[in-house]
Amino acid sequence: MAYPFQLGLQDATSPIMEELTNFHDHTLMIVFLISSLVLYIISLMLTTKLTHTSTMDAQEVETIWTILPAAILILIALPSLRILYMMDEINNPVLTVKTMGHQWYWSYEYTDYEDLCFDSYMIPTNDLKPGELRLLEVDNRVVLPMELPIRMLISSEDVLHSWTVPSLGLKTDAIPGRLNQATLSSNRPGLYYGQCSEICGSNHSFMPIVLEMVPLKYFENWSTSMI
């Protein structure tokens, strides 16, 4: 869940987001070490009078500053590629949900059910109940079972949109005429909020996404009541 003046990432609630958080920390540590080394060298150059104007060739130094950056890039690339492959894997999803972006709302269709589909609009500020979040609540939440692989098929009816839920590590473009897919799985129940992350017009800021992750038994009861 996000909170005001937050500087870090949202709490991870999916295996993919946990991997992304670890990769972020891993890369940030490398960047911090490189920045510290560069600042240290710059400070030495500014505070010492020693110079090497007569040095014309230094094979050892050139070898080091060629091999070292290559090794650093490999340390960053390997875990990044691993996560990319993990994000593309979809292993026997138990449920498929088709998501369509519109100006300016989302529509959802549970393709495994005969007639389970609805539109999801933002609740206006004047209609919010105590404790609800401004610009993030919707009239119809996307109810999904937790701890199970779910496939999202994402597209758009009009312009470019982007279906994003930060705490699940999801951000997939909704492109007219093209069907993108993403897989999600939540480790625990709860409400997870997102928003359209592609500028799509005057009401771009009013396209929230709310996922309600529940145990499988509650999801089955909900789906039965909706059909």
From Swiss-Prot:
Binding site for Mg(2+): E198
Protein keywords: Copper, Electron transport, Magnesium, Membrane, Metal-binding, Mitochondrion, Mitochondrion inner membrane, Phosphoprotein, Respiratory chain, Translocase, Transmembrane, Transmembrane helix, Transport
Co-factor(s): Cu cation
Cofactor note: Binds a dinuclear copper A center per subunit.
Sample GO molecular function, one term: copper ion binding
Membrane topology, from the record: Multi-pass membrane protein
TM ranges: 15-45, 60-87
Residues that bind Cu cation A2: C196, E198, C200, H204
One GO CC term, this protein: respiratory chain complex IV
Reactions it catalyzes: 4 Fe(II)-[cytochrome c] + O2 + 8 H(+)(in) = 4 Fe(III)-[cytochrome c] + 2 H2O + 4 H(+)(out)
Modified residues (Phosphotyrosine): Y218
Keyword Transcription part of the UniProt annotation: no
Positions that bind Cu cation A1: H161, C196, C200, M207
Residue ranges, Mitochondrial intermembrane side: 1-14, 88-227
A Pfam family that the UniProt record links to this protein: COX2_TM
InterPro entries (UniProt xref): CcO_II, CcO_II-like_C, CcO_II_C, Copper_CuA, Cupredoxin, Cyt_c_oxidase_su2, Cyt_c_oxidase_su2_TM_dom, Cyt_c_oxidase_su2_TM_sf
Protein function: Component of the cytochrome c oxidase, the last enzyme in the mitochondrial electron transport chain which drives oxidative phosphorylation. The respiratory chain contains 3 multisubunit complexes succinate dehydrogenase (complex II, CII), ubiquinol-cytochrome c oxidoreductase (cytochrome b-c1 complex, complex III, CIII) and cytochrome c oxidase (complex IV, CIV), that cooperate to transfer electrons derived from NADH and succinate to molecular oxygen, creating an electrochemical gradient over the inner membrane that drives transmembrane transport and the ATP synthase.
Quaternary structure note: Component of the cytochrome c oxidase (complex IV, CIV), a multisubunit enzyme composed of 14 subunits. The complex is composed of a catalytic core of 3 subunits MT-CO1, MT-CO2 and MT-CO3, encoded in the mitochondrial DNA, and 11 supernumerary subunits COX4I, COX5A, COX5B, COX6A, COX6B, COX6C, COX7A, COX7B, COX7C, COX8 and NDUFA4, which are encoded in the nuclear genome.
Homology family: Belongs to the cytochrome c oxidase subunit 2 family.
Record's protein name: Cytochrome c oxidase subunit 2
